[in-house]
Amino acid sequence: MKKMALTMLMGGSLAAQAADNLKFHGTLISPPNCTINNDQTIDVKFGNLLINKIDGTRYAQNVPYEITCDSTVRDETMALTLTLSGSVSDFNPAAVNTSVAGLGIELRQNDQPFTLGSTITVNEQSIPVLKAIPVKKSGASLKEGGFDATATLQVDYQ
C-alpha cells in the first residue's frame, strides 16, 4: 500500500510540468537630470518701493525661470516637482525673510501662496507662473534702505 501511494505522488508531479509561457521584459532608466535656469541664479529686481504702499499686492514681479531636462525618456509614474526652501518669515509661511525686519518676499504659484518647505507637482510642458511680492508684517515700521533675500527653488523627478 505504501509503494502504491508513493508511485501516485510521483506520477502527479510529472504531469504538472509545462513549458515556459510567461516572459518578462522592460527597460531600466534613470530619472532625467533637470535644472532650473541652467543652474544660474534668478535675480528678481524690485527697484524702489514706497514703504507705505507695500500691501501684499503691489510691486509683484514675475520670477523668470525655465526647467530643462536632459532626457526625453519618462516613466509615467514619476512626477516632476518643485520645492521651495529658505528662511521663512515669522509672519507669513509663504514669505522669505529679508534683511529688513518686518519685510518678507511672498512667493505665489499661479496666484496661490507657495509655502516655503512645500513641494508642488508640475507639468514640464506648462510650468506654473511664479511671482514674488513684497509683504509687510502687520504693525511693522519698516526702515528705509536696501533689502535682499534668498531662497532655493529645486526641481526633481519623484
Language-model features, listed with the residues they occupy:
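Sec-dependent signal peptide recognition
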Residues: M1-M8
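Mature extracellular/passenger domains of Gram-negative fimbrial/pilin and adhesin proteins
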Residues: Q17-Q158
